[in-house]
Amino acid sequence: MKDLLKFLKAQTKTEEFDAIKIALASPDMIRSWSFGEVKKPETINYRTFKPERDGLFCARIFGPVKDYECLCGKYKRLKHRGVICEKCGVEVTQTKVRRERMGHIELASPTAHIWFLKSLPSRIGLLLDMPLRDIERVLYFESYVVIEGGMTNLERNQILTEEQYLDALEEFGDEFDAKMGAEAIQALLKNMDLEQECEQLRQELNETNSETKRKKLTKRIKLLEAFVLSGNKPEWMILTVLPVLPPDLRPLVPLDGGRFATSDLNDLYRRVINRNNRLKRLLDLAAPDIIVRNEKRMLQEAVDALLDNGRRGRAITGSNKRPLKSLADMIKGKQGRFRQNLLGKRVDYSGRSVITVGPYLRLHQCGLPKKMALELFKPFIYGKLELRGLATTIKAAKKMVEREEAVVWDILDEVIREHPVLLNRAPTLHRLGIQAFEPVLIEGKAIQLHPLVCAAYNADFDGDQMAVHVPLTLEAQLEARALMMSTNNILSPANGEPIIVPSQDVVLGLYYMTRDCVNAKGEGMVLSGPKEAERIYRAGLASLHARVKVRITEYEKDANDEFVGKTSIIDTTVGRAILWMIVPKGLPYSIVNQALGKKAISKMLNTCYRILGLKPTVIFADQTMYTGFAYAARSGVSVGIDDMVIPAKKTEIISEAEAEVAEIQEQFQSGLVTAGERYNKVIDIWAAANDRVSKAMMDNLQTETVTNRDGVEEQQVSFNSIYMMADSGARGSAAQIRQLAGMRGLMAKPDGSIIETPITANFREGLNVLQYFISTHGARKGLADTALKTANSGYLTRRLVDVAQDLVVTEDDCGTHEGILMTPVIEGGDVKEPLRDRVLGRVTAEDIIKPGTADILVTRNTLLDEQWCDLLELNSVDSVKVRSVVGCETDFGVCAHCYGRDLARGHIINKGEAIGVIAAQSIGEPGTQLTMRTFHIGGAASRSAAESSIQVKNKGSIKLSNAKSVVNSAGKLVVTSRNTELKLIDEFGRTKESYKVPYGAVMGKGDGEQVAGGETVANWDPHTMPVITEVSGFIRFTDMIDGQTITRQTDELTGLSSLVVLDSAERTAGGKDLRPALKIIDANGNDVLIPGTDMPAQYFLPGKAIVQLEDGIQISAGDALARIPQESSGTKDITGGLPRVADLFEARRPKEPAILAEITGIISFGKETKGKRRLVITPLDGSEPYEEMIPKWRQLNVFEGERVERGDVVSDGPEAPHDILRLRGVHAVTRYITNEVQDVYRLQGVKINDKHIEVIVRQMLRKATIDSTGSSDFLEGEQVEYSRVKIANRDLEANGKVAALFSRDLLGITKASLATESFISAASFQETTRVLTEAAVAGKRDELRGLKENVIVGRLIPAGTGYAYHQDRMRRRAAGELPAAPQVTAEDASASLAELLNAGLGGSDND
């Protein structure tokens, strides 16, 4: 009995294992799994419904159909367990063995396994070094293959057609051996000597020079080595025995009406068995060769269909014309085993219902309908009822609950107390989509949700539904309370800002409460404290907005963490004094002494959390909510039509704009501007007009002028309802108010181009039919986009999670000195992100020195919290080197110091935190907010007037970087380089502003000159790009042939003529290869050289360029030779939003990437070919020069004789991340990807911490390619896990051997996920077949390191609370203490248990 109990305990424990290995199954192994051979295609008898003997459901092979009962009924009941009935041959045991016992089919002829044949690259083909087509022709009996050449001139593996075979037979007789079909391939594979082949290939590899051959050889060597090392035999890729799946995994269920529902696998197996039996019979009869051959081919096809239907030829379809689901289909895809049953399971103890508001709840509570609670907590209630003796049996308890007796409700109350439940709203995009609450029982049928957690769930109350789950075990309840409770999730893991922030009504209420008003009732009173303020407000003696003096006591923490009070009289308003009553001790009064908008409230809660900690913040947040709701109700703010005040200036602004447009139209008709320029200018005019109208409107709404008590006029901020809602951040924005009371403005077509007639009306005036019709375009586009976006965003999140899922914090400090240099993000005159936001919560990589001194301000390895950041700001530090996960030296994980602060908790990150998944969720969750294209606010085109000048905001000195310029005839500098940057440096040498200066801009100030604030330093024409000459001389046209490469356009109105270069598409055949160009020559007709080089000045003209000069005209340096009309920004290919983020993470090469210098050296140009120039870089140390061919149409940024650094831009374009990694290193590529991704998110106003993006970049960089092997056993050109190389090199260096040299690879997230070491994780992601095939051939072991693998095998994940469990397991295993198995078998135990139960129920065994 003791043994039995011991065993039952052990039953609940799973078998301990450390790794999963996948390999090819040998025929003997398949036979050893099997419990008998399936010989007949029959399934069950249609009359008795009993399984047929030897059929696909045979009870003798697979086990009994009923528990402990043989098929013929001779042996029933438990006492006969283990007996094999002599009549029907069935073992008496549990019926669940039908889920695990397999059978087999002995194939009459070998068949190839289609996965190893057709999954590219074909493993069989690679092993035999034969093309797949040839192998297929052999397998499907179209040609012969020579197996032994013998003494003949036939090679082994040679393919012979029928005729060739017959000729050879006549010539050589039986000297040689040639066969067809799978047995031929099997023989070839059997005869291979893998080790010898391997040696031979290695020799070849050392001798060969050709790159392609090397690649092919390495591939074969890798495959052969995999076979040798894994112990797989090549001939096992050909099946001679086919395993049969246990019958309960391919069920056959009788439906009513005599029909059966069956799994497709049964049909597929039936075909195989039928064909196999027929083939056996034909072989016994010694049938003619051609018939046997046909039958063998059909058998091969049947086995193919069973393993992977549709991979070869047409898929076999069932009766309903649908392709049958084969074994491969069972495991792959969203509906396959991995994603449907292993990674996502449905759970019991859950319910769902509509949500509604619970404004009276506390933050940690939710309202749960009584009906739901009763159903969810049933087992607990039954238990309690029995425990109290209110019900004698479970059955009685059940009856009581069904009758809903009064006592049941009391018990329910007890059960629910302190038992948290989980609330989840789909889609769960980040971890805050599931939180724990304490249930409060309510009447009704809707779940009540606390308003402050809506932001985290992204929930609203327009009919959203939520699911409730009950954590059952004690551990689960503990985790729910300690980790998942809504009160523990105040900060967002994406950016560390509070996510429990009031919104909408609450914000409006607090804003209304803290506004001040001139001449309000009770102005000028002096009050003794907040209590009195509330009293006089309630009594109606003073208005909420009255400006008064109040005595306030503020508390501050001293050195001993005691609160010290300080009382003073402060100018404030009645409302602010009342609000002060709920602010916790320890915060300054200045925090409420302002009109509180949404940002201010968020900041207030953040400050509270940082100063006072979690508990006061939660209480404070709750209080603000109650107060906000109360005062929003009192304020009576609502929207009426008169709140939308249309500015008086509107008509005048619009008529001015119309006049300007008419003028441009005239210029166009007289040929001064091209169609494209006209369109752009018109759009610019309207965009500017729109801005002016909205400015006039906002000025009008914002303030009204009132005379105060002293008779002085002052600007009073308006109490207009619409304005208050927008200003407080409760609802609406300036852009929306503009459409209500300004003008709707320009609209976009669905393709993103902007319609040039704007909608001048607004919604208050109403739209006419045409205007309404124009606006429907954009509005519909918005809806269609949203639908597409959601799916795309979800897929991006899935790829991110998959690539980062196994990244966990595994140690405290890796001790690296590597780091990333952080500087503020400056775009134009604005600091987009100050330094403090970028370094807050990171760990310093080196000491920070106080600027201008040698004093250490912050030591290395300091976590920069708010106080440290204040210190940095105080000393105006403008660059800090911080630790980053990309440089972390930890193997298979990250250290806490390189990660820094846990954003959701505010302290340094704990070991075991799953930072990979957090990063993926933080990047993926806002994905739905990113637009697919970057313009549209309700369809209105948001496009500012194009920039045409640079105006600095502060005073300072100018610094130009990578600038080249010439002085034009007017003595002004003209920029002739393409990625010039202009920085404004203040007197301390800090960068204040930074601008991009385009090619062709005229500079008002030169490098190093001083400028005053507001001065314009550069200007240019935004709509055309000039081609500027760098030398003076005369023009000579080359290849400019009228009608072939150029056409002359004469304007009818003005008679001005200009030349337009034709696009290559528009040219005649003769003009295709011509390169129109302008050459500059001197008076004698000789080429003028570009200064500082020996290149002639020749300017190639791209298509569409307009030349307004004639051949032979004299020009001077800095003049424009031609104009290239720029397309508007609407159609310029800036992939915005989500697709851009996906491109960056997939590390896709841009279409025409920038060309970067491969080495540092001096530029020169070699011999040109027809369409390309030869760029030569000669290194300074005299080593081998580097050559590259560059197409002539690429604009070059460098001149002959110029010195370039490795990684400098030679020719413009978007940079390819792979090039950046290769030439500038890991940190540069990290910086590039981080900044580019952040740009997209910043545009949408989404804040994400850089850390998260760095985590993903680390995962993209986790592979390395071996350049030279050293003493290691890697192959050259092999791609290996970066950690593996590091560990191997450490060992080699420790033993004084030569380390392997490698270069880091940048993989896109999909590639990186598929290249992970764990084949289980990769197979559950994408391309399941390919991953499993590769893994099986290599005999891979999965060490179950990541999260996904552990979820799939059903273990605790090695992160979070499971981290300790896994660490402990590793320790125990290292110490060699693994739990001993009990001495009872599963069968015995469950049987004895059943016997006990029967005895207890008074049943007797002897009837």
UniProtKB/Swiss-Prot annotation:
TM spans (from-to): none
MF GO annotations: DNA binding; DNA-directed RNA polymerase activity; magnesium ion binding; zinc ion binding
Cellular component GO terms held in the UniProt record: DNA-directed RNA polymerase complex
Cofactor needs: Mg(2+); Zn(2+)
Residues where Mg(2+) binds: 460, 462, 464
Positions annotated to bind Zn(2+) 1: 70, 72, 85, 88
Record field: catalytic activity: RNA(n) + a ribonucleoside 5'-triphosphate = RNA(n+1) + diphosphate
Enzyme class: transferase
Gene3D superfamilies: 1.10.132.30, 1.10.150.390, 1.10.1790.20, 1.10.40.90, 2.40.40.20, 2.40.50.100, RNA polymerase II, clamp domain, RNA polymerase Rpb1, domain 3
UniProt binding sites for Zn(2+) 2: 814, 888, 895, 898
Keyword terms: DNA-directed RNA polymerase, Magnesium, Metal-binding, Nucleotidyltransferase, Transcription, Transferase, Zinc
Pfam families documented for this protein: RNA_pol_Rpb1_1, RNA_pol_Rpb1_2, RNA_pol_Rpb1_3, RNA_pol_Rpb1_4, RNA_pol_Rpb1_5
InterPro entries the record matches: DNA-dir_RpoC_beta_prime, DNA-dir_RpoC_beta_prime_bact, RNA_pol_asu, RNA_pol_N, RNA_pol_Rpb1_1, RNA_pol_Rpb1_3, RNA_pol_Rpb1_3_sf, RNA_pol_Rpb1_4
EC numbers on record: 2.7.7.6
Record note on quaternary structure: The RNAP catalytic core consists of 2 alpha, 1 beta, 1 beta' and 1 omega subunit. When a sigma factor is associated with the core the holoenzyme is formed, which can initiate transcription.
Function (record text): DNA-dependent RNA polymerase catalyzes the transcription of DNA into RNA using the four ribonucleoside triphosphates as substrates.
Protein name per UniProt: DNA-directed RNA polymerase subunit beta'
Gene: rpoC
